[in-house]
Curated annotation (Swiss-Prot):
Subcellular location: Cell inner membrane
Protein's GO biological process: protein transport by the Tat complex
PANTHER family given in the database record: SEC-INDEPENDENT PROTEIN TRANSLOCASE PROTEIN TATA, CHLOROPLASTIC
Pfam family, one: TatA_B_E
Keywords recorded for this protein, A-Z: Cell inner membrane, Cell membrane, Membrane, Protein transport, Translocation, Transmembrane, Transmembrane helix, Transport
Family the UniProt entry places it in: Belongs to the TatB family.
GO molecular function: protein transmembrane transporter activity
Subunit note: The Tat system comprises two distinct complexes: a TatABC complex, containing multiple copies of TatA, TatB and TatC subunits, and a separate TatA complex, containing only TatA subunits. Substrates initially bind to the TatABC complex, which probably triggers association of the separate TatA complex to form the active translocon.
Name of the protein this chain belongs to: Sec-independent protein translocase protein TatB
Recorded GO CC terms: TAT protein transport complex
Role summary: Part of the twin-arginine translocation (Tat) system that transports large folded proteins containing a characteristic twin-arginine motif in their signal peptide across membranes. Together with TatC, TatB is part of a receptor directly interacting with Tat signal peptides. TatB may form an oligomeric binding site that transiently accommodates folded Tat precursor proteins before their translocation.
Annotated Basic and acidic residues bias: 96-108, 115-132
Length: 132
């Protein structure tokens, strides 16, 4: 990864031993290795995310081509891309649609009289406080 040879590694180790000492050197090595591991994980995560986004972009381009050509005379590759894109769109929309539907049903099920009763209770308690 860094293209470091054996003698360069030995030189870095000796300098680290002189600068940090034998007590702090193992802790410093562990810290550096954790940092490098975290950097590698972050780089892999970004790489995976970019490849996913590029795949989505490619699917969208194939869908545009399919719309322009007409749905009748598509190549098998484009047909599979269109189907895959439709499935992805349905899977994305489904959780939001289910949530919106359940919220709508909950809102319809709650009676409005509860709000009116609470307002009346507040008015009565305010009137009682004024009377005292």
């Amino acid at each position: 990864m860094f293209d470091i040879g054996f003698w360069e590694l030995v030189l870095i180790s000796v300098v680290g031993l002189v600068v940090l000492g034998p007590e702090r050197l193992p802790h410093a090595i562990r810290s550096v290795s954790r940092f490098i591991g975290a950097a590698k994980n972050m780089a892999n995560s970004v790489k995976d995310e970019l490849s996913h986004e590029l795949k989505v972009q490619e699917l969208q381009e194939n869908l545009r081509k399919a719309e322009q050509m007409g749905m009748e005379d598509l190549s098998p590759e484009l047909k599979s891309s269109v189907e895959e894109l439709k499935k992805a769109a349905q899977s994305v929309n489904r959780p939001y649609a289910d949530k919106a539907q359940s919220e709508t049903e909950t809102a319809k099920a709650e009676p409005v009289t509860e709000s009116a009763e609470k307002v009346e209770e507040i008015k009565v308690s305010a009137a009682d406080k004024k009377a005292e």
